């Protein structure tokens, strides 16, 4: 799938589903589930690298894990889920030339067909515009932006009028720049609904209500494997408890055998 194909999903009122992945096994599970998008998110910092936030993740980490994810795909590159890679902290806030270089490394050295970038500050918009002109598709990300948690925290965004209106303006700006879709994270449902109505490109929600054109979830959260479960993601199984008990049973049985 190509990024440009997602617009057809919105026109046809076809829900877009995205899952995160971080290695070959999770990539295989995400792709075989039928997800339209497999996102190698910088959330892998917490999911598999043991960090407390996304900030320590490097460009090399993202390239390494994106390649691992793609090796789990069963279909040909032209047919499999759209593979998107997060640009980690300080790889696109460091000037246009460096951002193009780093995004280019992701696209050239992995099977990712797009990058995701958080925020819409003027400097970030300049970078997004440049990347798109250079032929690199960009997925936007507004609302709660984890890379900005030192300034904004991890709380719900858009609750005050000023923030509410800014997120709406930023969404329109990102569409105008050429983003093929926008992730809306942890914002009021009404705000997400208004943005979805205003935009021609699809919105993909996570903790943003039911009116987005699609939904994305961190796979580890869905499977109940995360240490801290976000309030907007109900696990489909208590994976940590289930697999923990099964492993204990096996260890016990092996010791007694």
UniProtKB/Swiss-Prot annotation:
Which residues are connected by disulfide bridges in this protein? none
Q: In which pathway does it act?
A: Cofactor biosynthesis; (R)-pantothenate biosynthesis; (R)-pantoate from 3-methyl-2-oxobutanoate: step 1/2
Quote the catalytic activity from the record: 3-methyl-2-oxobutanoate + (6R)-5,10-methylene-5,6,7,8-tetrahydrofolate + H2O = 2-dehydropantoate + (6S)-5,6,7,8-tetrahydrofolate
Cofactor(s) it depends on: Mg(2+)
- One short Pfam family name for this protein? Pantoate_transf
Binding-site positions, Mg(2+): 42, 86, 118
What are the GO BP annotations of this UniProt entry? pantothenate biosynthetic process
GO terms of molecular function: 3-methyl-2-oxobutanoate hydroxymethyltransferase activity; magnesium ion binding
Free-text remark on how the cofactor is bound: Binds 1 Mg(2+) ion per subunit.
EC number assigned by the record: 2.1.2.11
- Amino-acid positions noted as binding 3-methyl-2-oxobutanoate in the UniProt annotation, renumbered to this chain: 42-43, 86, 116
Predominantly, its location class is cytoplasm
Any idea which UniProt keywords this protein has? Answer: Cytoplasm, Magnesium, Metal-binding, Pantothenate biosynthesis, Transferase
Question: Where in the cell?
Answer: Cytoplasm
Active-site residue numbers:
185
What are its GO cellular component terms?
A: cytoplasm
Q: Which domain of life is it from?
A: Bacteria
**Cross-referenced PANTHER family, in alphabetical order?**
3-METHYL-2-OXOBUTANOATE HYDROXYMETHYLTRANSFERASE (PTHR20881:SF0)
Family listed: Belongs to the PanB family.
Kindly state the subunit structure of this protein: Homodecamer; pentamer of dimers.
Question: What function does the entry list?
Answer: Catalyzes the reversible reaction in which hydroxymethyl group from 5,10-methylenetetrahydrofolate is transferred onto alpha-ketoisovalerate to form ketopantoate.
Tell me the protein's name. 3-methyl-2-oxobutanoate hydroxymethyltransferase
Q: Which organism is it from?
A: Prochlorococcus marinus (strain MIT 9515)
């Amino acid at each position: 799938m190509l990024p440009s194909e997602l617009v057809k999903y919105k026109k046809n009122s076809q829900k877009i589903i995205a899952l995160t992945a971080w290695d070959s096994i999770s990539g295989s599970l995400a792709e075989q589930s039928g997800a339209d998008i497999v996102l190698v998110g910088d959330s892998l910092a917490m999911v598999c690298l043991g960090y407390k936030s996304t900030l320590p993740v490097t460009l090399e980490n993202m390239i390494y894990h994106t390649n691992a994810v793609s090796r789990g795909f069963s279909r040909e590159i032209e047919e499999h889920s759209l593979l998107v890679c997060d640009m980690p902290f300080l790889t696109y806030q460091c000037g246009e030339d460096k951002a193009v270089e780093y995004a280019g490394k992701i696209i050239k050295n992995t099977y990712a067909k797009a990058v995701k970038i958080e925020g819409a500050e003027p400097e970030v918009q300049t970078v997004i515009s440049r990347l798109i002109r250079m032929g690199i598709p960009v997925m936007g990300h507004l609302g709660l932006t984890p890379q900005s948690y030192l300034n904004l925290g991890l709380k719900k965004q858009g609750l005050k009028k000023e923030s509410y209106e800014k997120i709406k303006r930023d969404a329109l700006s990102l569409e105008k720049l050429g983003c093929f879709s926008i992730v809306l994270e942890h914002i009021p449902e009404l705000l997400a609904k208004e943005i979805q109505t205003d935009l021609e490109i699809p919105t993909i929600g996570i903790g943003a209500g039911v009116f987005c054109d699609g939904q994305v979830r961190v796979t580890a959260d869905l499977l109940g494997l995360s240490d801290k479960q976000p309030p907007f993601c109900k696990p489909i199984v208590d994976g940590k408890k289930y697999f923990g008990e099964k492993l204990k049973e096996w260890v016990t049985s092996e010791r007694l055998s």
